[in-house]
Amino acid sequence: MKKSLIALALILCMLLCTCGANEVATAESTEAGSIKETTPDYSNALILADQGMFSSGGTVTDPVEGTYDSTTNWLDATRAGNTAHVDHANVLYQIPAGETGNPMVFLHGYGQSRMGWMTTPDGRDGWSNIFLKKGHGVFLVDQPRRGEAGSTVTMTEDGFLDAWAADSKDYKPGDQAWYTHFRIGRVAPERYKGSQFPEGEESQNQFFRQMTPNTGSLDMAVAAEAMNAVLQDVYEMTGKKSVFVTHSQGGAIGWNVDVKNMAAIVAIEPGGTPAVGSEQYQNLLAANIPIVIYFGDYIDNGPEDIMSTGFWKGIRDGAVAFAEQYNADGGDCIVVNLPDEGITGNSHFMFQELNNQQIADHIGAWMAERGLE
C-alpha cells in the first residue's frame, strides 16, 4: 500500500511538472510570437473608395403571345405574357482612393469577358489593378450576350429556351485554334521562343477556362448601342470622359461607339480599323480623339505557313494606313509595334502576359503626354 501511494505521488508530481512546463512553453511561445508580430505594411496597398456593378442600355422585349397566369407562373413553360430585359452591357467598377486620372472603360474581345482584364493566367495583377494603382477608376464591361450580360432576345423568341433541346446551339471547341491564331505558340502547349505568355500547364489551364461563348448572335450594332450607354453612365458618375480600352473584336465595336464621352482610345490589336473617310473615321477626327493602337510579337517573325501570320500582318498594315491618314487629316494616332519598342515576346493577349506591367506603363506614358494621367 505504501509503495502504491509513493508511486501515485510520483505520477502526480510528473503530471504537475509537465503541465507547468507546458504552461511555461506556451507562455514563452506566446511571448515570442508577440515579439515577432509587427504592424502590417499597407503603404503599397490598393485602397478603394468605391466599387459596385450596374447594367447599361438594353431593351425590353414584347410580351410572349398569350396571357400571363400568375397562378401557374414559373411552371408555365410557354412563358405567355412574359417580357425580358435583354441586350444590355454589365459593368463592374472600382474607384481608387485618391483618384486622379480619367476613368478607363475596358471592353473585352471575342470569346472573353471582363475577367481577362482582372487577372493573368498565373495569378498576377491584371490591367484593372495596375491602372487602379495609377489613379484611374476602372469600369470593366461584359458586352451584350456575353458573361454577366447574357440575357438576350433568344430567351423569349421560343417562349422558353430549352438548353437540352435537340436544336440547341452546340459549343464549338477551340483551345488549339485560339492558341495558334493568337500567336501564343504553333501548337499548344508549346510556346514561341521568347514568349511572355506565362509558362506551365496550370497557366494554360487557367487561360483556356477564361473563354466563354456568346449566348446569342454577335450583333455589332447592339453592342455599340450598349457601349454608348456605358460611356454615358460613366460620365454621369464621374463627370469625366473615359479612356476607352478595347481588345480584338471589342476594338471593332469600339470604332462604332459615340465619341461624345470619350477622352481617348487605346486599342489592343483591334479587329480592324475604320475605313478612311467613313462615318466612324469622320466622327473620331471631328472630336479630335487621340488613338493609340498596340500590336505584339510574332507577326513579322511568325511562321509563314500559318494563315494567321498573314492575317495579323494585314490587320496591322490596315492600322498603319489608318494612322497615317488620320494624322495627315489633323488627328493624333500612333501605332505601337511592341518589338520596335524593344518589348518582345507578346501575343494577342499582351495584357495577361509576364510583362503586362511594362506595357501598361507604356500606355500610361502615352496618356500622360495627353493630360490623361
Model-derived features with residue positions:
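Gly/Ala-rich beta-loop-alpha elbow adjacent to hydrolase catalytic centers
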Residues: V245-G254
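N-terminal cap/lid segment of alpha/beta-hydrolase-fold proteins
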Residues: G33-E99
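Catalytic active-site module of serine/aspartate enzymes centered on a nucleophile-bearing elbow/loop
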Residues: G345, F349-E373
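The feature captures the conserved acid-bearing segment of alpha/beta-hydrolase catalytic domains
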Residues: A267-L338
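Conserved alpha/beta-hydrolase
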Residues: R124-A149
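Active-site glycine-rich loops that stabilize anionic/oxyanionic intermediates
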Residues: H108-T120, G271
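Conserved acidic catalytic loop of the alpha/beta-hydrolase fold
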Residues: A221-S242
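Short beta-strand element of the alpha/beta-hydrolase
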Residues: G101-G109
